[in-house]
């Protein structure tokens, strides 16, 4: 936990030392935290999806192929949410609409 706090504080210091603009530095911090949370949520969702598919296949091996197809569709939808977060993060970092 101490390493994570140290990393966040050091990134905040790096962000605040750039130009002195508060909006830009807050955007960098928010982008990092937002993308990290999106990736964390996506990873948890993918893990739960895979665990449920493995459990379902173990209980009834006959429906394994149907479960795999459904799992891949679900994984694509979960990953799409993380990609949307990445796109929003890149917009906030490089074409920040709050800077005017």
UniProtKB/Swiss-Prot annotation:
Membrane topology: Multi-pass membrane protein
Subcellular location: Cell inner membrane
Listed transmembrane segments: 27-47, 72-92
InterPro entries: ATP_synth_csu_bac/chlpt (IPR005953), ATP_synth_F0_csu (IPR000454), ATP_synth_F0_csu_DDCD_BS (IPR020537), ATP_synth_F0_csu_sf (IPR038662), ATPase_proteolipid_c-like_dom (IPR002379), F/V-ATP_Csub_sf (IPR035921)
Primary location recorded for the protein, binned into one broad class: membrane
Function: F(1)F(0) ATP synthase produces ATP from ADP in the presence of a proton or sodium gradient. F-type ATPases consist of two structural domains, F(1) containing the extramembraneous catalytic core and F(0) containing the membrane proton channel, linked together by a central stalk and a peripheral stalk. During catalysis, ATP synthesis in the catalytic domain of F(1) is coupled via a rotary mechanism of the central stalk subunits to proton translocation.
Family according to the record: Belongs to the ATPase C chain family.
Subunit relationships: F-type ATPases have 2 components, F(1) - the catalytic core - and F(0) - the membrane proton channel. F(1) has five subunits: alpha(3), beta(3), gamma(1), delta(1), epsilon(1). F(0) has three main subunits: a(1), b(2) and c(10-14). The alpha and beta chains form an alternating ring which encloses part of the gamma chain. F(1) is attached to F(0) by a central stalk formed by the gamma and epsilon chains, while a peripheral stalk is formed by the delta and b chains.
UniProt protein name: ATP synthase subunit c
